[in-house]
């Protein structure tokens, strides 16, 4: 379920457009608007319902969005996707949980709907690198390291540290990795061929 938080009634046509294009989406606003759910406070609503939605879309100023969600944020594995759209639909900004929560993908989708510009700041997206923390879900793989260790590996990877990739299976995902291999990644197909001095992402 997605929630659209409408700050100004002037953006109601934009909110209605997004609701039509995005399945399972409800519009919440302090204004009395037909087809919308009335709330008394955006900040209080977010505090009480932050984790009830898989995505939250603010239509309005980025500052209102940030102040509303600030006290609710836990980590990228638990937080919903949060996207902020300016009142005209010109800029669509991925705010929170870009990869794991899907905010980056939703940002691109909304920008395509509004004809606006998708603003995405995650390094792997802008550098054209793999989003390591979403590959498992995309290709039905399993992550076997703790979140903290995964975050450390992601940081090393996006900073283009020399990386070893062991591909000891073949499926759609490994074929994608081979096709899109970054220059700082070296592939091995047998574990015993990897020099022990090198780090391993497996």
Per-range role (PLM):
Residues 100-196:
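Internal alpha/beta core interface subdomains
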Residues 201-202:
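Conserved small/polar residues in nucleotide/adenosyl-binding loops
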Residues 1-31:
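N-terminal basic/disordered segments at the start of proteins
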Residues 11-15, 64-68, 103:
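Short glycine/serine/threonine-rich phosphate/pyrophosphate-binding segments
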Residues 27-48:
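N-terminal beta-loop-helix "entrance" segment that forms/cooperates
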Residues 73-99, 105-121:
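Short, acidic/small-residue loops that bind anionic groups at enzyme active sites
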Residues 5-10, 29-32, 59-62, 123, ...:
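Structural motif
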Residues 46-50, 55-84:
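Hydrophobic/aromatic-rich, well-ordered segments within soluble, folded domains that form packed cores
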